[in-house]
Every structure is written in structure tokens, then in C-alpha cells.
Design a protein with these regions (language model features):
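Alpha-helical transmembrane segments of multi-pass membrane proteins predominantly involved
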Residues: 1-277
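Single conserved hydrophobic/aromatic residue that forms the stacking wall/gate
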Residues: 276-284
Length: 284
């Protein structure tokens, strides 16, 4: 058992790419630990769960801060260009952890006055924080879509978390429908851009046609070569990607759903929705 543990921890070295996302892995493990603690602890010890969630995130935050202070990250690519880390992304990771800690604290106060499941709330907040930390590091449309959809699916549950409230259930249903619509629009735009940029004769077989930088270079260098249908596909694909992201963050003119969803969602959920989705996605 000890040998397996040493071998596992030994994998998180500076040369191993998994060490780059160690804070996100720690949040995922912590979320699973909370669910396991709920089953293992007696009812009179359930109050330890929110403390475990908060202090666990504090430990992860210290790891991120230590990386900011002592590690010279520079501009580093991991997982074949799926994510890029630099000083700004490290600061954004710390921002998500701080806001997630505050949301868990607000959630503890809110849930103490409600007869609602508590552990699942903290686990979902941790998953959202981990996904958003990956989102701001994404350099590829695959990572962008997977991380963004992980956040969105978790929000589907959190918006309708107050299941005894008609307004909360209504908000959850509206968010589910509009979220699915925005995901479809975003994915369709990504497919169109990949379809035109994935041509090896234009892009080159060694380049990643879903990478932001490579795609931008392709469009810039081939502006004069893309005529007729190809040029129209690029424009439509770009428009759909922008529209899908604007739907997600509630930007004008796609903000109609925001008042209804925020009105019915629990207060901590509204806080986590704005801090974890709107502001960082706008920055991205």
C-alpha cells in the first residue's frame, strides 16, 4: 500500500504534466471526500462537512499561492496545448478559490435555515471552481467546451436547488432550456471553424485546428484565400461562437434570461454564478 502511494505521489513532479493541474485534482478529490464523509459521519457530526469544504479549499489556495510566489511559471503549455499557464491564469485560479470559499461560507448560513441537502451543494461548488480554473487556462476549444459544460451542468442543479420553491424550479427549467440552446450554438460554431480550418492543405497537418492561437493565425494568413463559401463559413462560425459565449454570460443582447434565473435561484447560487461564470468568461 505504501509503495503504491509513493508511486502515485511520485508522478506529480515538475516533468509530469499532471502536476500542472494538481489544485484542480485536489478539488475533485475533496468533492468526493465530502460525499463520502456524509455517508460515514453520524448525523450529529454532519456540521463538520462545511468546515471540511472550506478548510480543504484553503489548503488548495495555499498551494496555488505558493506556486505564484515561488514557481516561475512563465508561459507553459501542457497536454499538447490544451491548457496554457502563466502568471495571469495563476491569479485567476486563486480568485476562483477565494470566491468559492466565500460562497461555501454563505451557503453554510443559507442552508442552516433551509431543510435542503447540504453536502451536495458544497460538492457542486467545488466542481464548478475546478472547472472554471481549467476554463481560464484553456487554449483549445475542446477544453473550453468541456470545462464550460461542466460548470453549466452543475449550475442546472444549483439554480433549482431550492426544490420546495416554485420560483427556483422555474428558474432551473429556464436555465436548462436556454443553457442547452447556448451550448448547441457554441458547439455548432466550433464545428464550422474546425471544418474549414481542419483542411490539412490550408492549416497544415502538424497544427491543431482547435487551438485558439493556431486558428487565429490561420484566419489571419488566409483571409485573401478564403472566398465565397469558405469565407462565409468562417464568419458564421465566429458569430455562433461569440453568440454562444454571450448566451452563457448573459451579455447584451442575450441577457433576457438573467433576471428570471437570478430571481429564483438561491442567493449563494446567484453569487457563485456571477463570480464563477460571468466575470471570468468575459475576461477569457
Amino acid at each position: 500500500m505504501n509503495e503504491l502511494l509513493v508511486e502515485f505521489l511520485g508522478g506529480f513532479t515538475k516533468t509530469n504534466q499532471w502536476s500542472a493541474i494538481l489544485p484542480e485534482i485536489m478539488l475533485g478529490v475533496l468533492a468526493l471526500a465530502l460525499l463520502g464523509a456524509e455517508m460515514a459521519l453520524p448525523k450529529n457530526k454532519q456540521t463538520l462537512i462545511p468546515r471540511l469544504a472550506i478548510w480543504g479549499q484553503v489548503i488548495v489556495l495555499l498551494v496555488v499561492i505558493g506556486c505564484i510566489v515561488w514557481c516561475n511559471v512563465g508561459e507553459s503549455e501542457y497536454f499538447s496545448g490544451l491548457i496554457i499557464q502563466n502568471d495571469i491564469t495563476q491569479i485567476m485560479r486563486a480568485f476562483f478559490l477565494v470566491s468559492s470559499i466565500l460562497v461555501c461560507y454563505l451557503g453554510q448560513i443559507y442552508l442552516s435555515k433551509q431543510s435542503l441537502p447540504k453536502t451536495e451543494f458544497y460538492a457542486l461548488v467545488l466542481i464548478i471552481a475546478a472547472a472554471m480554473m481549467l476554463l481560464v487556462q484553456s487554449a483549445n476549444f475542446v477544453m473550453l467546451f468541456v470545462a464550460l459544460e461542466t460548470v453549466t451542468v452543475a449550475f442546472y442543479v444549483l439554480v433549482a436547488y431550492s426544490r420546495t420553491s416554485q420560483f427556483s424550479l422555474e428558474s432551473g427549467l429556464k436555465y436548462l432550456i436556454l443553457g442547452a440552446l447556448s451550448s448547441g450554438i457554441l458547439l455548432f460554431g466550433i464545428v464550422l471553424l474546425y471544418g474549414i480550418a481542419g483542411n490539412p492543405e490550408l492549416m497544415g497537418s502538424s497544427r491543431d485546428s482547435l487551438n485558439y492561437n493556431e486558428l487565429a493565425k490561420f484566419i489571419t494568413l488566409n483571409t485573401n484565400n478564403l472566398v465565397g463559401v469558405d469565407n462565409m463559413i468562417v464568419k458564421i462560425g465566429t458569430l455562433l461562437v461569440v453568440a454562444g459565449i454571450c448566451f452563457k454570460i448573459g451579455a447584451v443582447p442575450f441577457q433576457i434570461w438573467v433576471p428570471d434565473v437570478y430571481q429564483g435561484a438561491p442567493t449563494p447560487v446567484t453569487a457563485v454564478s456571477y463570480t464563477h461564470l460571468t466575470l471570468p468568461t468575459t475576461w477569457l
